[in-house]
Amino acid sequence: MLHSNIYSLQTEATNKILSTSSLEELESLRLYYFGKSGVITACLRSISTINNIEERKSIGSAVNSICAELKSLMNSQKEKLHKIQIDAQLMEDKIDISLPVRPKQIAKLHPISKTLHEVKHIFVSLGFKLSDGPELEDEFHVFDALNTHKHHPAREENDTFYLKKLVNNKRIVLRTHTSSVQIRTMESNNGNYPIKIIAPGKVYRNDWDATHSPMFHQIEGLYIDKNINMGHLKYCINYFLKKFFGENIQIRFRNSYFPFTEPSAEVDIKCSQKNWMEILGCGMVHHNVLTNVNINPEQYSGFAFGIGIERIAMIKYNINDLRKFYSNKLQWLTHHGFCFTNLIT
């Protein structure tokens, strides 16, 4: 009786397994037949009640074979239903290839980085070499060696950032200009001429408004050799300004005063029909400065100049507030930034 029942149970289970249409339905069938209280599980338990050993072996072998076939069929049906489920989901989630892709955000070069690169490129084409120095400096390299006396307004604490702690009994400042690099270069020159350098870098002054920042970028230049005169300086400055702003730019030199140059000049460019704008300071290196770094002013002369990078960037790219350079606003940088392909190489 059990023998005939198990085969009819196989036929019934096979038909039900093949007719399932979902993984959930198939799992319910598995529990119905093979769970702890399942129909086939009960048949397996009842085998032990058969007294005839040969009959018990025959029925046990048949039940085990049927169990293996049904479980194999369930696994095959499970794979089939799983594939159908995935295909249906893919059809539901298909991508509309007619839709435009999201635009890629391309990195932009900051206007200050662009300006620094361009200025350095122009002066390197004139034979200047790049030179660098520390941003934390002692007073000698920032002021004393540059002929700036102890009572000069630039040395007051409301204009300059001083460190509270002395180093080797010297007051340390955040450099107010990269002229300190010029001093260090002349000190370590060891009689090798000409000295022809530009010193780009960050400088610090205690000021903050639409046209001033407590930290800004500067490039200073220095050219020391025999028989260097004001004509060399004017040619160099004119060449730079025409390359940077365009050949049609109008330039004028005005007498001025700086403690580290004599004669000194400020250079203006014409921004409209009536208005001139100061763009940089320059002059012939003062004899006292040369003497302070053990260069004989009777044999050697030279010129120096200083350019504020933010200032010329504001003029060239029509930016009216210096503070926007450091605002970190992505919208502003996207508008005023430059593609890397625009770099001069």
Swiss-Prot record:
Main location group: cytoplasm
The organism of origin for this protein: Ehrlichia canis (strain Jake)
Gene name of the encoded protein: pheS
Protein family according to the UniProt entry: Belongs to the class-II aminoacyl-tRNA synthetase family. Phe-tRNA synthetase alpha subunit type 1 subfamily.
Catalysed reaction equations from the record: tRNA(Phe) + L-phenylalanine + ATP = L-phenylalanyl-tRNA(Phe) + AMP + diphosphate + H(+)
Cofactor or coenzyme needed: Mg(2+)
A Pfam family: Phe_tRNA-synt_N
Keywords: Aminoacyl-tRNA synthetase, ATP-binding, Cytoplasm, Ligase, Magnesium, Metal-binding, Nucleotide-binding, Protein biosynthesis
MF-aspect GO terms: ATP binding; magnesium ion binding; phenylalanine-tRNA ligase activity; tRNA binding
Classification via PROSITE patterns: AA_TRNA_LIGASE_II (PS50862)
Protein name, UniProt field: Phenylalanine--tRNA ligase alpha subunit
Record's cofactor remark: Binds 2 magnesium ions per tetramer.
CDD domains: PheRS_alpha_core
Binding of Mg(2+), residues: E262
UniProt EC number: 6.1.1.20
PANTHER family: PHENYLALANINE--TRNA LIGASE, MITOCHONDRIAL, PHENYLALANYL-TRNA SYNTHETASE
Claim: Signal is one of the keywords in the record: no
Any one Gene Ontology BP term: phenylalanyl-tRNA aminoacylation
GO cellular component assignments: cytoplasm
Subunit: Tetramer of two alpha and two beta subunits.
Localisation: Cytoplasm
InterPro entries named among the record's database cross-references: aa-tRNA-synth_II, aa-tRNA-synth_II/BPL/LPL, Phe-tRNA-synth_IIc_asu, Phe-tRNA_ligase_II_N, Phe_tRNA_ligase_alpha1_bac, Phenylalanyl-tRNA_Synthase, tRNA-bd_arm
Enzyme class: ligase
